[in-house]
Amino acid sequence: MSNQNERVAAAPFQEAVESPAQRILWERLRTYDHSFPLSDYSPETLFSSDLQTLEHEFRRFGVSELDRGDQDNYVNGYDALRSFHERSRSASVMGSPYGNLEDVPYLPSNPFFDQTPWSDDAYGYMYGIRNTLLSRAKDGIESHMLQYVIAKGLKETIDKIFDNLISHVCELMLDYYGHKVFRKLMEKCTDEQITRVLDIVLEEPFEFVRLCVHTHGTHAIQGLMRSLCSEEQISRFMETLCYVSLLLTKDVIAHRVILFCFNQFSPSHTRYLLEVIVQNCYQVAIDQNGCCMLKKLIRQSSRELRDPLIKEIISIAVRLCGNCYGNYVVQYLLRLKDYEVTSALSKHLDGNYVQLSYDKYGSHVVQKCLESREFSSRRIIAELLSDIDSLLVDPYGDYVIQTAWIVSEDHVRHVLLFYINRNVPFMRCNVYGRKLLQKLNIWT
């Protein structure tokens, strides 16, 4: 008997079902009835006002007026994720915003966002619960919705979003999703708002460094740099950056801020930053990340910027050659194949080739100099002959002699062969000497 009454009560609604979207609404109402049993769904029911509100919420999201493509999407996965604000309001009526799922976890078929969640009021979507705007910006799905609102919203909407996030700007810049919202917001901010962000970011140098060395923070800082437009803003930023630049150049992540700065701003703005790097060139070059930054800076910068840096590197080239990281900076200058650079470098290295050949890292530089067409290999070999007896049995010098043998012409090779033959008995008693004889195929 109860089943018959249930069919009678449901009949008016079943007759009204004309589209997949309305079937969805019908299924949701049946779920609501399962959670809160009612005698019927007539307007006189105690909960009729709640049901009307519920139906209005469905229509607000376009359920009752979908086109054919949207209907197909909702048929295949009608449980598209709604905003947190809408879910919280639905939960007060239905218990669970997606029906009585018992212990089954909810996995939305549409992992992105509603098609038109801000159809009524763009800012009303997020402003309903004021304190959750930061959590929305840090949410994987709702951050996309917030970025859309920022991109399409009016100035009043952006101002309200900015006022709610400005006090949490540093936390936002360090978050995986939040820093994307921050960068989008910077594109829409006024000069006054950007200045307010600068006041917070640059207030404490330690906090600024913490942002720059963070994976997401460094991208957020670069987004802020793109938004700087006035001379005052750029000058304030560069002043703080110069103060901590030595720390940033030695960090694997933060050195990108230094490189981006030279690409983003004019030489007049980066002049003092370049001076700091040049004055501390040796400290930067002997650091693992610093040497990489110097090579990128030389490769990417204009001649106006890189010439002072190259000049300083050449002046300390002998010291750099003996360092495990600094020698790569000197080798990079050889790869430029610039006659003026190699000529100046050759003048500073002359007289030091023997000393460098005994060094683990310096020997690599000597080998590169021998292979470089811009260097005179004959002059280098002539210097090596002054102490060739020791180089032939040295663990690093023997590699230099091998390279000299390969790059030398016949008449120079005959000179090398004379000295090698003279030291064969001594070389046979030494592990490195024997290896050299085998490499040169002159084992006798």
From Swiss-Prot:
* Gene Ontology biological process terms in this record: post-transcriptional regulation of gene expression; regulation of translation
Pumilio repeats span which residues?
128-163, 164-199, 201-239, 240-275, 276-311, 312-347, 348-383, 384-418
Cellular component annotations (GO), alphabetically ordered: cytoplasm
Record-annotated PUM-HD domain positions: 107-444
Residue runs in coiled coils: none
Specify where it is mainly localized: cytoplasm
Tell me a Gene Ontology molecular-function term this record carries: mRNA binding
InterPro entries annotated for this entry?
Answer: ARM-like, ARM-type_fold, PUM-HD, Pumilio_RNA-bd, Pumilio_RNA-bd_rpt
Q: Which UniProt keywords apply?
A: Cytoplasm, Repeat, RNA-binding, Translation regulation
Q: Does the keyword RNA-binding apply?
A: yes
Under the heading Pfam families, the entry gives: PUF
Q: Which Gene3D superfamilies match?
A: Leucine-rich Repeat Variant
| Localization | Cytoplasm
SMART domains to which the protein is assigned, alphabetical = Pumilio
- Comment, domains: The pumilio repeats mediate the association with RNA by packing together to form a right-handed superhelix that approximates a half donut. The number as well as the specific sequence of the repeats determine the specificity for target mRNAs.
Per the entry, what this protein does is: Sequence-specific RNA-binding protein that regulates translation and mRNA stability by binding the 3'-UTR of target mRNAs.
**By what name is this protein known?**
Pumilio homolog 15
Q: Which organism is it from?
A: Arabidopsis thaliana
- Protein encoded by which gene: APUM15
